[in-house]
C-alpha cells in the first residue's frame, strides 16, 4: 500500500480502538480510497481486541458497489454483495457474513423489515459520504445499525454550516490532499 493508505489505516484503527468513534478520511480522487477500505477492513478483522466485527461498505452507485466488491475479493478479503434490499436484510442477519458491500438505497427495505444491529463492533465505511449522509438515507442506516462506528471516505468534503461532513462523522481522521497527490506524482493534472 502507499504511505497515505498506511497512515490512514493506522489512524483509523487508533480512533476506533481508543475513542470508539469514527470520522472522515479525506483523500483526493485517484489516491486509492477503495484499497484503503480493504486494508482497514482487513486490520479490523485481524485485530484480536475487536470481537466478532462486521463491516458494511456503503456506496451511492451500483457501479461503485460492483467495483469495491471486486476490489475486496481480488485482494483476498471475502465480501458479500447485497443485490437487493431483501438480500441485504438476509446478509445483515447472517452472523457468519463479516463483510458486506451495498448501495445505500437498499436500507429502506431493511428498515421496513425491522432488522436492527446493536453490536459494538459494527463498522460502516461510507464511500463519498458527503453525497448521501444528510437526510433520509443516513437516518435509515442509523436506524438499522444503532451502535455502529461510521467512517466516511471522501475526496471532496462538504463543510457548510448546515452540512458539515466532519461534524456528521466525528472529525478528520486523515487527510491526503490534491496537492499531496500531485507532489507525489500519484495523480497528474489534465490540461485541455
Q: Residues of each region from the PLM?
A:
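RecA-like P-loop NTPase motor core of helicase/translocase proteins
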Residues: 1-192
Amino acid at each position: 500500500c502507499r504511505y497515505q493508505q498506511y497512515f490512514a489505516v493506522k489512524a483509523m484503527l487508533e480512533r476506533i480502538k481508543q475513542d470508539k468513534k469514527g470520522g472522515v478520511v479525506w483523500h483526493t480522487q485517484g489516491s486509492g480510497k477503495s484499497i484503503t477500505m480493504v486494508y482497514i477492513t482487513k486490520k479490523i478483522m485481524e485485530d484480536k481486541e475487536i470481537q466478532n466485527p462486521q463491516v458494511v461498505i456503503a456506496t451511492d452507485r451500483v457501479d461503485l458497489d460492483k467495483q469495491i466488491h471486486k476490489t475486496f475479493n481480488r485482494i483476498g478479503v471475502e465480501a458479500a454483495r447485497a443485490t437487493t434490499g431483501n438480500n441485504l436484510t438476509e446478509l445483515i442477519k447472517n452472523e457468519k457474513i463479516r463483510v458486506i458491500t451495498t448501495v445505500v438505497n437498499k436500507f429502506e427495505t431493511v428498515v421496513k423489515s425491522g432488522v436492527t444491529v446493536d453490536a459494538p463492533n459494527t463498522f460502516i465505511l461510507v464511500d463519498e459520504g458527503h453525497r448521501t449522509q444528510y437526510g433520509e438515507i443516513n437516518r435509515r442506516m442509523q436506524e438499522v445499525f444503532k451502535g455502529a462506528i461510521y467512517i466516511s471516505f471522501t475526496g471532496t468534503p462538504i463543510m457548510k454550516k448546515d452540512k458539515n461532513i466532519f461534524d456528521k462523522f466525528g472529525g478528520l481522521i486523515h487527510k491526503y490532499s490534491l496537492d499531496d497527490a500531485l507532489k507525489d506524482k500519484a495523480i497528474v493534472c489534465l490540461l485541455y
